[in-house]
């Protein structure tokens, strides 16, 4: 399939390869002089500190371009108030590569309540304020001021998820594509190594960047529609233009793939290819101007966008912005295993740049002994952008490449103790899983391979993952291999052998999984499995933990205020937590990040997962007001006395006054309990048995297994990574993982970072 694609490691190298490999990519003129360079071919500008590690975007992109023969310099966290820092490496011969960093700068700087954060895990000493709001725009402006005639290439998570007109939570309005606002020359979206290498070589050959309009995984700003394309008009919901040819609408088909939960009599999947060649067809989205004032049309546009993400059958998109046309090419072809091995096998130093001295960079400390084994996610959770950024098709590394990296960690990472903190990716257990039918995979438009049930064509055999775990444990010098990426438990229960292997050898006391909610309404809109699946996994987890002679615990993640969640839903979740003796130390309030389906629900109050019409649509209840969002968060922390007055008021309003009091079935005590001291409340049994944190600190508070594990020599490990950990998969000029919409940490901590992962988070890695 697509045999005409040139592997990224087979391009003819640029002449400057004669300079060899730099110990670190230069960040100053002095370092350039030491390498014998008179100039840089490419200068990368990033909002993160420069850590030469494959979990950091600039390192992957910089080392990849260096391997192609280019001289690459890095300007990390420049002073953006003027152009001085942007001229520190001189004028690049080819282009500036600009990214906000591993995270969207707005998510990095603000909480879900739009409060300014005072820390930054990607900055030395966790110092906040080292990058501007909308860093991609600001950096692009300064690059243009520094050298007006140098092309600007945008990439990373911020640019990728803002490539079309999008709802912006912080300004509460629809904004233009970041490409037009930044006035850059081209935007690369997703894990764009393939596109970036092509752009670099074509520029090196003397081609004008304005001529590069047909590269997969890119978006460009055009004056008019390109010639040679059939344009399908989806700019309206019910009244398309009469002059446009309207083929049978592929978005009207509501049939689902056969799932494993269905009866055997279910009909098999029927492949119905489009009557148009995807390579010469484009879909017109509603214009930016229309989306500004029409929320229902925005939901329609979001639906179309998400249905065109398949790299094999998805079509180009075109969207009017004033008198300009935004042209978004087809999604990039996924990297092969050989290409993935090439990217992760580049000569990374695996430590921060020496200029930072002894300063601690929290994001690096979190992932310095972890290994990314794959990219992509076919979970399709509506609050997560991984599919839109990394793709639904899993891109795997070979076992040999992964084991080699384990040996590099052993040999290169200072202070390595023998523990590998994670083998994972967006999820822990999608390694080498995927569609068993290439034809179906090439034409499928399902947003998820596992919802509402696991597709019969999905290979769920975890054999390769089990073999990898066993091989990793045999690497000399490796004493323990932990799995910190979130486990997709609906997949795991399809392979009991995997669950046994995981629980027996790779859980350090706690394992984080993400049911996200207990109620069917929110779960369906999240595209998450029901609690019955969670219960089955918990039974297996407890069974195998007991067989292994270990006391281990599941830590469930939940989201408050997700679109589709009513006060009644959150109350039922709180009652479930109390019934199961769970007390969330910190909670997650839904965070509408760009391009997520859930963000479209939040803005439009309409379900974009189904066909959208003005008079025929599914409306979605949304918690938008500050008070209701506080209430939903408070219900997740029902045990916190500070939340009791708000919960009491809500219970009375809902006609649930019987849940106030000291009876076993009550959620919060009567008002007279407020005057008691914390010690008195603990003595009265107001606190549940299982108190847990959803954002890890250096210790895990209050879980009953701590003493048992300590006594047996088994240290509880991070069952999931901190919300401030970096993501771990490559994308053009940085930004390694899409952030989750629902990943803001709340509770007592106001400074918790949003994860770029789904898991992981990543986007920390959190299974979605």
Swiss-Prot record:
Residues 679-689 have a biased composition (Basic residues). [4Fe-4S] cluster binds at residues 377, 381, 384. GO terms for molecular function: 4 iron, 4 sulfur cluster binding; catalytic activity; iron ion binding. Residues 719-731 have a biased composition (Polar residues). Binds 1 [4Fe-4S] cluster. The cluster is coordinated with 3 cysteines and an exchangeable S-adenosyl-L-methionine. Keywords: 4Fe-4S, Iron, Iron-sulfur, Metal-binding, S-adenosyl-L-methionine. Residues 674-768 are annotated as: Disordered. Its cofactor is [4Fe-4S] cluster. It comes from the Bacteria. Belongs to the UPF0313 family. This is UPF0313 protein VV2143. PROSITE patterns: RADICAL_SAM. Residues 363-640 form the Radical SAM core domain.
């Amino acid at each position: 399939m697509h045999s005409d694609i040139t592997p990224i490691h087979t391009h003819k190298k640029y002449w400057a390869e004669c300079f060899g490999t730099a110990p670190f990519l230069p960040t100053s003129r002095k370092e350039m002089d030491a390498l014998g360079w008179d100039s840089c071919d490419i200068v990368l500008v990033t909002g993160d500190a420069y850590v030469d590690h494959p979990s950091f975007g600039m390192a992957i992109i910089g080392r990849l371009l260096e391997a192609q023969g280019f001289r690459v310099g890095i300007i990390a966290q420049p002073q953006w108030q003027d152009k001085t820092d942007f001229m520190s490496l001189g004028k690049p011969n080819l282009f500036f590569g600009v990214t906000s960093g591993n995270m969207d700068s707005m998510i990095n700087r603000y909480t879900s309540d739009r409060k300014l954060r005072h820390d930054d895990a990607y900055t030395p000493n966790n110092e906040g304020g080292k990058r501007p709001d909308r860093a991609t725009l600001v950096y692009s402006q300064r690059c243009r001021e520094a050298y007006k005639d140098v092309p600007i290439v945008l990439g990373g998570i911020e640019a990728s998820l803002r490539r079309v007109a999008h709802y912006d939570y912080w300004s509460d309005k629809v904004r233009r594509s970041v490409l037009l606002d930044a006035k850059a020359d081209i935007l690369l979206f997703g894990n764009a190594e393939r596109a970036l290498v092509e752009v670099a070589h074509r520029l090196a050959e003397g081609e004008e960047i304005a001529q590069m309009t047909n590269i997969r995984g890119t978006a460009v700003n055009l004056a008019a529609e390109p010639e040679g394309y059939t344009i399908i008009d989806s700019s309206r919901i019910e009244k398309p233009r009469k002059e446009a040819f309207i083929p049978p609408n592929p978005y009207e088909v509501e049939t689902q793939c056969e799932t494993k939960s269905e009866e055997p009599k279910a009909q098999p999947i029927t492949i119905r290819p489009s009557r148009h060649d995807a390579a010469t067809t484009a879909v017109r989205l509603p214009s930016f101007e229309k989306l500004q004032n029409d929320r229902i049309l925005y939901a329609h546009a979001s639906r179309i966008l998400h249905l065109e993400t398949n790299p094999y059958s998805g079509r180009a998109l075109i969207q009017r912005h004033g008198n300009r046309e935004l042209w978004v090419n087809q999604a990039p072809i996924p990297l092969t295993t050989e290409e993935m091995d090439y990217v992760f096998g580049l000569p990374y130093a695996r430590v921060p740049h020496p200029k930072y001295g002894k300063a601690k960079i929290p994001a690096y400390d979190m992932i310095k002994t972890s290994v990314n084994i794959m990219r992509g996610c076919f979970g399709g959770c509506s609050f997560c952008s991984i599919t839109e950024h990394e793709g639904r098709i899993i891109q795997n590394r070979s076992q040999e490449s992964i084991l080699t990296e384990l040996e590099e960690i052993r040999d290169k990472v200072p202070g390595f103790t023998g523990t590998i903190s994670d083998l994972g990716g967006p999820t822990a257990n999608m390694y080498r899983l995927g569609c068993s039918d290439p034809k179906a995979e090439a034409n499928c438009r399902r947003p998820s391979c596992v919802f509402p049930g696991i597709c019969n064509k999905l290979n769920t055999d975890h054999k390769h993952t089990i073999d990898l775990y066993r091989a990793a444990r045999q690497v000399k010098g490796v004493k323990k291999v932990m799995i910190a990426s979130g486990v997709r438990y609906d997949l795991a229960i399809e392979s009991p052998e995997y669950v046994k292997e995981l629980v027996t050898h790779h859980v350090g006391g706690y394992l984080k999984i993400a049911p996200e909610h207990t109620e069917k309404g929110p779960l369906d809109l999240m595209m998450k499995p029901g609690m019955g699946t969670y219960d089955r996994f918990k039974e297996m987890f407890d069974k195998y933990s007991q067989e292994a002679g270990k006391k281990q615990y599941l830590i469930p993640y939940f989201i408050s205020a997700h679109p589709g969640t009513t006060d009644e839903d959150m109350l039922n979740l709180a009652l479930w937590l109390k019934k199961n003796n769970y007390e969330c130390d910190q909670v997650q309030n839904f965070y509408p990040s760009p391009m997520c389906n859930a963000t479209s629900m939040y803005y439009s109050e309409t379900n974009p997962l189904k066909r959208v019409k003005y008079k025929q649509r599914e409306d979605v209840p949304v918690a938008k007001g500050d008070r209701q969002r506080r209430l939903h968060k408070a219900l997740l922390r029902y045990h916190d006395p500070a939340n009791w007055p708000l919960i009491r008021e809500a219970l009375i309003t809902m006609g649930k006054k019987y849940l106030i009091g000291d009876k076993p079935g009550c959620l919060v005590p009567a008002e007279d309990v407020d005057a008691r001291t914390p010690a008195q409340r603990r003595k009265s049994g107001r606190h549940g048995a299982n108190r847990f944190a959803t954002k890890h600190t250096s210790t895990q508070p209050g879980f009953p297994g701590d003493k048992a594990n300590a006594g047996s020599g088994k240290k509880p490990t991070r069952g999931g990574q901190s919300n401030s950990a970096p993501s771990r998969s490559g994308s053009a000029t940085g930004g390694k993982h899409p952030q989750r919409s629902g990943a803001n940490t709340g509770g007592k901590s106001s400074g918790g970072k949003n994860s770029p992962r789904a898991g992981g988070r990543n986007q920390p890695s959190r299974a979605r």
